[in-house]
């Protein structure tokens, strides 16, 4: 009889390549790096600032805008070129932020509208008033100093009030002197009317005496003739 064949151990199951990949994925996951902050303002703001500072009558071209961005903000214009063109083609012109004076699309020239210029000019005085506010706050301090000086003035006023009665007494003395001077010339005028009065009284006395003596002398002979007529 032949010996029985030895039993063969079952082979271990081989892991599939798909499962191996799934196990490796958690190991490959790494925390994402935070995005670096921008070193320049938005593209729209940079383009508007470029057109504003260039102040070209016919408008600023795409090349002129790029040169300004490189000089002013030191950015990579090649990376920002698609964003600049996109802003110039659609957003800026459609929204009314820019006016296209020449060409079509991003290849033309662009200019700021008149309304945008007026708004920017109106905003400048607001900044000026904001800067002046701290100066206005400093003024009350000067007013406080003036109040102190005003408080000191009444002391000087009291001193002057004491001196005023002295001035009044001097004025009274000065007023008494002209009164005495006016009283002195009065006795000089008194003898003049005395000389005039006796002249007027002497004239009527001479005229009245002769008239009264002549009239009764003429009437006496008429009264003696009447008794002679009765005797006849």
Curated annotation (Swiss-Prot):
Instruction: From the UniProt entry, list the residue stretches annotated as the region Disordered.
Output: 1-44, 103-232
Comp. bias intervals (Low complexity): 1-18
**Which cysteines bridge via disulfide bonds?**
none
Q: Which InterPro entries match?
A: H1/H5, Histone_H1/H5_H15, WH-like_DNA-bd_sf, WH_DNA-bd_sf
- GO CC annotation terms, alphabetical: nucleosome; nucleus
Q: Please state which protein family the record places this protein in.
A: Belongs to the histone H1/H5 family.
Q: Record's superkingdom?
A: Eukaryota
Q: Mind telling me which SUPFAM superfamilies this protein's record contains? A: Winged helix' DNA-binding domain (SSF46785)
Q: Which residues form the H15 domain?
A: 39-114
Q: What does this protein do?
A: Histones H1 are necessary for the condensation of nucleosome chains into higher-order structures.
Biased composition of type Basic residues is found at 149-171, 179-232
One Gene Ontology term of the molecular function aspect: structural constituent of chromatin
Is Membrane included in the keywords of this UniProt record? Answer: no
- Membrane-crossing ranges are none
Indicate the principal place this protein occupies in or around the cell: nucleus
Subcellular compartments: Nucleus; Chromosome
Question: Which GO biological-process labels does this protein carry?
Answer: nucleosome assembly
What is the protein's given name?
A: Histone H1-II
One Pfam family cited in the UniProt record for this chain: Linker_histone
| Keywords on record | Chromosome, DNA-binding, Nucleus
- Provide the species name: Glyptotendipes barbipes (Midge)
């Amino acid at each position: 009889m032949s010996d029985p064949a030895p039993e063969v151990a079952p082979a271990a199951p081989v892991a599939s390549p798909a499962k191996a990949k799934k196990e490796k994925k958690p190991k490959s996951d790494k925390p994402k790096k935070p995005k670096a902050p921008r070193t320049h303002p938005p593209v729209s703001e940079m383009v508007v600032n470029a057109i504003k500072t260039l102040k070209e009558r016919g408008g600023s071209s795409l090349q002129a805008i790029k040169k300004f961005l490189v000089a002013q903000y030191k950015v990579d214009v090649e990376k920002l070129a698609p964003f600049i063109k996109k802003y110039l083609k659609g957003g800026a012109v459609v929204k009314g932020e820019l006016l296209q004076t020449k060409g079509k699309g991003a290849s033309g020239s662009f200019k700021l509208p008149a309304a945008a210029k007026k708004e920017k000019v109106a905003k400048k005085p607001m900044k000026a008033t904001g800067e002046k506010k701290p100066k206005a706050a400093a003024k009350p301090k000067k007013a406080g100093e003036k109040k102190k000086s005003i408080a000191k003035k009444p002391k000087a006023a009291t001193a002057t009030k004491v001196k005023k009665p002295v001035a009044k007494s001097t004025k009274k003395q000065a007023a008494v002197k002209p009164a005495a001077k006016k009283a002195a010339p009065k006795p000089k005028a008194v003898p003049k009317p005395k000389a005039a009065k006796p002249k007027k009284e002497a004239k009527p006395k001479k005229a009245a005496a002769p008239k009264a003596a002549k009239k009764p002398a003429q009437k006496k002979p008429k009264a003696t003739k009447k008794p002679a007529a009765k005797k006849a």
